[in-house]
Amino acid sequence: LGIEKSLVAKLAYAYHLTLGPGTLGLGVDIGMLSKSFENNFIAIDDPTLDPSIPNSGTSAATFDFGAGAYYYIPNKMYVGISTLHIPQTSVEDVADQGGVGALDFQQSRHYYIMAGYDWDINNDKKWILKPSVLAKTDAASTQLDVNALIEYNMKVWGGVTYRVEDAIGLIVGANVGEFISFPGLKLGVAYDLTTSTLADHSSGSFEIMLRYCTNIYKQPKREVYRSVRFL
């Protein structure tokens, strides 16, 4: 924030293969992380007393990679596990600073586990209940999200989400493309209300999601060659 700037660039690749009734996806990503600090930091006290703040403008970069696996059965269930910052590299630049007030940003490995299930309430594929969970940890602290959405006719949905000891939220959305003849367009809104001690200083947060998905690969048309010899 302020004098600090971050730049992350990654390339990701996933391979899908059929496994039983579903599909298993295996993926990796590799990239770089860059951190920089400007030299126009203004502090009311002496900033050189804080070894975590660079004494002058500096920047540095390092590589990073992650991996994950995801198994899903369409319109039925999914489960996934992944980890980020596997090498736990650090972004550091101690040149010409004597190691005091130098840039030293350590990345921590993060783990994610998620799972979800689609329950056809009336067995008519109209009302679908979608409970799901997401657990995140860096081996020092853990965060758990519990969600429940209900979807009608694959067009509109709504539900609640609860982040343990942190927040509770409401979610609504619609597959707006179905209403305006623009397939693949979805719109969603969410409001999170803080339940932790931060509630005294926060009235919650409001989010808007706009998503468009389309298939960029089109199945080639089958061409038939006819010859008078075989008519």
Locate each region found by the language model.
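Subset of outer-membrane beta-barrel
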Residues: 1-231
